[in-house]
């Protein structure tokens, strides 16, 4: 599936483990993790449209205006590769994408491993999402006006490892490789 730059490792007929990256990253974020599972699982890595080696011409602002479009891509990968009994590992926004995919086709998934998920980023009465609506609006405006500058400033802060600046640099590079159109659609799903 060239749209999502799907790559496989591990046991060809083993239980599938699909590893899905978060915003601003690509399948390479899993490079240190997947080898630990390759002797037992069929490892399936991919890039969301707009990230890594995905087909950027496949980006459709209407399809990807909500997470359902990304969940449909996950299901298309599973269908094309005949993946069943899937262990889906989703980081950040991909955790929610995995939940949506599993809700549509629960028979396809054995387990969901949700790494750093947040169903909603905006604080509300009785709920801590981590941001105010103003925070999110400011973030989106910054993304739209200066994506590369935002990437360079935010990546080290997101990593939070001042003693390992190479991690912030790696995330900055990952953000800079991503198609900046992708996060802009999130205005429609910010609440």
Regions found by a protein language model. Name each.
Residues 22-25, 92:
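Active-site glycine-rich loops that stabilize anionic/oxyanionic intermediates
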Residues 99-145:
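Flexible "cap/lid" loop of the alpha/beta hydrolase fold
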Residues 14-22:
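Short beta-strand element of the alpha/beta-hydrolase
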Residues 26-28, 121:
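Short substrate-entry loop that stabilizes the transition state in hydrolases
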Residues 29-43:
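Short amphipathic alpha-helix adjacent to the substrate-entry channel of hydrolases
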Residues 123, 127-131, 141-191:
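Conserved alpha/beta-hydrolase catalytic His-Asp/Glu region
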Residues 2, 7, 38, 44-93, ...:
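Active-site loop/oxyanion-hole signature of alpha/beta-hydrolase fold enzymes
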């Amino acid at each position: 599936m060239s749209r999502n730059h799907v790559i496989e490792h591990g046991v060809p007929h083993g239980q599938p483990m699909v590893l899905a990256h978060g915003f601003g990253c690509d399948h390479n974020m899993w490079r240190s993790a997947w080898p630990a599972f390759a002797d037992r699982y069929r490892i399936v890595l991919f890039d969301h449209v707009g990230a890594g080696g995905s087909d950027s011409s496949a980006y459709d602002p209407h399809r990807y205006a909500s997470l359902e479009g990304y969940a449909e891509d996950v299901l298309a990968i599973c269908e094309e590769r005949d993946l069943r009994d899937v262990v889906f590992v989703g980081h950040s926004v991909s955790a929610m994408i995995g939940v949506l995919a599993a809700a549509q086709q629960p028979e396809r998934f054995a387990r969901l491993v949700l790494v750093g998920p947040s169903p909603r980023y905006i604080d509300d009465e009785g709920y801590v999402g981590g941001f105010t609506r103003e925070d999110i609006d400011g973030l989106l405006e910054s993304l739209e006006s200066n994506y590369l500058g935002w990437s360079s400033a935010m990546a080290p802060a997101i990593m939070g490892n001042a003693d390992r600046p190479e991690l912030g640099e790696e995330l900055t590079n990952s953000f800079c490789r991503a198609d900046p159109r992708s996060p802009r659609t999130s205005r429609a799903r910010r609440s």
